[in-house]
């Protein structure tokens, strides 16, 4: 929690104002932030200085793992995080590749599970990684990549957290996740949970021990309409100790994650938190 608050304070103190063309808003911005999560010792990085809704973050991750491309599927899992980008983004609404209501296009999990090959067919990046790690293989390229510039025009949003690189040292699994851009008051709350849970899940279904998850953010920013709440409310609060995250031990395989797993298979204990803060969201 301290590293999260340190980043927020750094942006407030050292950030530079940048005009964001996509949203039409100003952002207070810093370049490069590195966060580390101790998954092996179950130090769950859930924000405590405001109430955080971890279930939606896990549901979104499950949707990525399943390769979903429709906001309705994400809602069925338990999150509305894609409703706005799928249905309120004017550029996407005018895009000829949009298939209709709730369609997200070829974003995130679609790239992870069905990356289009130039000679036809698709590559299932995630399955390859799971198969390798399950056999104890680390080819130094166990990388799940969502960033496909050749298909940006076919999706409602470029990926923000675009790369997850898994590494084995003995029987301990590590993760390096890279994020090009982060709305720190809103998005980072989700992204920290997802990086942590992704390593925990991958370790469980490949029979490895989870180690550390490293989370790099390139452009970390606070939107102008979020600044007052961050500076004058959230940063004035004292954080609580980290809670713990629990996964149903019956989850054994990638197929389990693809089929029967729901939010009921996850739990958080020991979570103390301050009152919620309603930060504005920028589409």
Curated annotation (Swiss-Prot):
Compartment list: Cytoplasm
Gene3D superfamilies for the chain: Thymidylate synthase/dCMP hydroxymethylase domain
Catalytic activity: dUMP + (6R)-5,10-methylene-5,6,7,8-tetrahydrofolate = 7,8-dihydrofolate + dTMP
Pathway, per record: Pyrimidine metabolism; dTTP biosynthesis
Keyword RNA-binding: no
EC number from the UniProt entry: 2.1.1.45
Pfam families the record matches: Thymidylat_synt (PF00303)
Catalytic residue positions: 160
GO CC terms: cytosol
Positions contributing to dUMP binding: 22, 180-183, 191, 221-223
UniProt-annotated binding residues for (6R)-5,10-methylene-5,6,7,8-tetrahydrofolate: 183, 282
CDD domains, per the entry: TS_Pyrimidine_HMase
Keyword field contains Cytoplasm: yes
GO biological process entries: dTMP biosynthetic process; dTTP biosynthetic process; methylation
Keywords: Cytoplasm, Methyltransferase, Nucleotide biosynthesis, Transferase
A GO molecular-function descriptor: thymidylate synthase activity
Domain of life of the organism encoding this protein: Bacteria
InterPro entries the UniProt entry points to: Thymidate_synth/dCMP_Mease, Thymidate_synth/dCMP_Mease_dom, Thymidate_synth/dCMP_Mease_sf, Thymidylate_synthase, Thymidylate_synthase_AS
Role: Catalyzes the reductive methylation of 2'-deoxyuridine-5'-monophosphate (dUMP) to 2'-deoxythymidine-5'-monophosphate (dTMP) while utilizing 5,10-methylenetetrahydrofolate (mTHF) as the methyl donor and reductant in the reaction, yielding dihydrofolate (DHF) as a by-product. This enzymatic reaction provides an intracellular de novo source of dTMP, an essential precursor for DNA biosynthesis.
HAMAP family with a match to the protein in the record: Thymidy_synth_bact
Family: Belongs to the thymidylate synthase family. Bacterial-type ThyA subfamily.
PANTHER family assigned to the protein according to its UniProt record, in alphabetical order: THYMIDYLATE SYNTHASE, THYMIDYLATE SYNTHASE 1
NCBIfam families, sorted: PRK01827.1-4, thym_sym
Assembly notes: Homodimer.
Protein name according to UniProt: Thymidylate synthase
């Amino acid at each position: 929690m301290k590293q999260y608050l340190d980043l927020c304070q750094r942006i407030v103190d050292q950030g530079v104002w940048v005009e964001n063309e996509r949203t039409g808003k100003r952002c207070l911005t810093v370049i490069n932030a590195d966060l580390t999560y101790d998954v092996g010792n179950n130090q769950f990085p859930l924000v405590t200085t405001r109430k955080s809704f971890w279930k939606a973050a896990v549901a979104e991750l499950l949707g990525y793992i399943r390769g979903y491309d429709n906001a309705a599927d994400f809602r069925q899992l338990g999150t509305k995080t894609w409703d706005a980008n799928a249905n309120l983004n004017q550029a996407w609404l005018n895009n000829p590749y949009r298939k209709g209501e709730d369609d997200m296009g070829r974003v995130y999990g679609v790239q992870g599970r069905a990356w289009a090959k130039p000679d036809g067919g698709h590559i299932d990046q995630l399955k390859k990684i799971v198969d390798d790690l399950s056999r104890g293989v680390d080819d130094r390229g166990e990388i799940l990549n969502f960033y496909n510039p050749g298909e940006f025009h076919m999706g409602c949003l470029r990926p923000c957290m675009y790369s997850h690189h898994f590494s084995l040292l003995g029987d301990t699994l590590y993760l390096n996740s890279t994020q090009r851009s982060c709305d720190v008051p809103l998005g980072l709350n989700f992204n920290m949970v997802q990086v942590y849970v992704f390593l925990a899940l991958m370790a469980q279904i490949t029979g490895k021990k989870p180690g550390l998850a490293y989370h790099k953010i390139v452009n970390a920013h606070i939107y102008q309409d979020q600044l007052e709440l961050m500076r004058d409310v959230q940063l004035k609060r004292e954080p609580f100790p980290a809670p713990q995250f629990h996964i149903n031990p019956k989850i054994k395989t990638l197929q389990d994650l693809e089929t029967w797993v729901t939010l009921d298979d996850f739990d958080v204990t020991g979570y103390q938190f301050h009152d919620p803060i309603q930060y504005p969201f920028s589409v």
